[in-house]
UniProtKB/Swiss-Prot annotation:
Protein name: Orotidine 5'-phosphate decarboxylase
Position of the signal peptide: none
Function text: Catalyzes the decarboxylation of orotidine 5'-monophosphate (OMP) to uridine 5'-monophosphate (UMP).
The family this protein is said to belong to: Belongs to the OMP decarboxylase family. Type 1 subfamily.
Active site: 63
Pathway: Pyrimidine metabolism; UMP biosynthesis via de novo pathway; UMP from orotate: step 2/2
Transmembrane segments: none
């Protein structure tokens, strides 16, 4: 099922910065928030407990990639935090992804990263030595992710349709790199607007700087949410 709330990437360096940002929103508004490496390493597991205590949903974006037993053990710990979604690198392999699923259990969504949205085809071929097209690599990883029993993948919106065709229509496609028209793309090579992401079939979208660095973050969030959901029935 699609998520009507854009996921806000909390790319902040400290707990206090997050508190200041969230204080801008009405206390009763339930948000979907992404906690990435920078914030998690700075604030620790307490940041997740804090956000959940405020009634928000949490996507813990740590992109685990290690031997299967280590990932399984780490996922057991994350499951106790009450996260709503977390992820691994598909490049870790099917056995690692299965171990992650077992460790996390079924109460949270588990998705995999295929290729980072900052990766171009030339970079993939040169540095990863994967001599296929970028799309072929993404489809391969998506199939392996489905095989491992995960809920979906992180992918660019340009890849959503081919991934759902290669797996199944209910396979989650979470799309970062979302930018409203006219906003600088930053360091991500493959980007799309919220309306385009909806039309192409994305299930979740992640938006960071266009909200967190906006002059009015609350207005920016609602404008993006309106664009994302404008054609929903």
């Amino acid at each position: 099922m699609r998520e009507h709330r854009p996921i806000i990437a909390l790319d902040f360096p400290s707990f206090e910065a997050v508190k200041e940002f969230l204080a801008l929103f009405p206390a009763e508004e339930s948000l979907y928030l992404k906690v990435g490496m920078e914030l998690y390493y700075a604030a620790g597991p307490e940041i997740v407990s804090y956000l959940k205590g405020l009634g928000h949903s949490v996507f813990l974006d740590l992109k685990l990639h290690d031997i299967p037993n280590t990932v399984k053990s780490a996922m057991k710990v994350l499951s106790q935090l009450g996260v709503d979604m977390t992820n691994v690198h598909a490049a870790g392999g099917v056995e690692m992804m299965k171990a992650a699923r077992e460790g996390l259990g079924s109460q949270a969504k588990l998705i995999a990263v295929t290729q980072l949205t900052s990766t171009s085809e030339a970079q993939m071929q040169e540095f990863q030595n994967i001599q296929t097209s970028l799309q072929e690599s993404v489809i391969h990883y998506a199939k392996k992710t489905a095989e491992a029993g995960l809920d979906g993948v992180v992918c660019s919106a340009q890849e959503v349709q081919v991934i759902k065709q290669a797996t199944n229509p209910d396979f989650i496609c979470l799309t970062p790199g979302i930018r409203p028209a006219g906003v600088a793309v930053g360091d991500q090579k493959r980007v799309m607007t919220p309306a385009d992401a909806y039309q192409i079939g994305s299930d979740y979208i992640v938006v960071g700087r266009p909200i967190t660095q906006a002059e009015d973050p609350v207005a920016a969030y609602h404008a993006i949410k309106d664009e994302w959901t404008q054609d929903w029935n």
